[in-house]
Swiss-Prot record:
Composition-biased stretches (Basic and acidic residues): 34-45
GO cellular component terms, semicolon-separated: cytosolic small ribosomal subunit
Protein name per the record: Small ribosomal subunit protein uS15
A GO molecular-function annotation: structural constituent of ribosome
Domain of life of the source: Archaea
Record keyword Transmembrane helix present: no
Protein source organism: Halobacterium salinarum (strain ATCC 700922 / JCM 11081 / NRC-1)
Signal peptide: none
Lineage: Archaea, Methanobacteriati, Methanobacteriota, Stenosarchaea group, Halobacteria
Amino acid sequence: MARMHTRRRGSSGSDRPTADEPPEWSDVDEDAIEERVVELAEQGHDPSQIGLKLRDEGVQGTPVPDVKLATGKKVTEILEAHDAEPELPEDFRNLLEKAVRLHEHVEANGQDHQNKRALQNTQSKIRRLADYYRGDKLDEEFAYSYETAREIIEE
């Protein structure tokens, strides 16, 4: 599959091994995993960071290689069930942060044409994702602008 704003192909990688159940060495209780997920979310970690922490640090010293295999739910589903989900989806928030950083850089460095183009591409991605999330995770009247992005990020 191709990338969005280039003529190159996407990067390929190895597939994860298919598994129907968690490995034998990772026998952590589902409730303990859910508690740890909510605890990490309350500390301010994003869902992807939570997955990495569970993989590396684990619960009670035992690593959890795949939360969905261990609990039957994704990290975001666990957060929704415990009312600890972030206000905005993680991918959308990351794009907003990137756009704010790029906008400030372009204002300070007006001749940086490469990053002007990068800002345009990022804003395009934000508008596409906003269309996808509008009405569900975003307000129906949401319209992207630098000011609204900065306000959202500062919250």
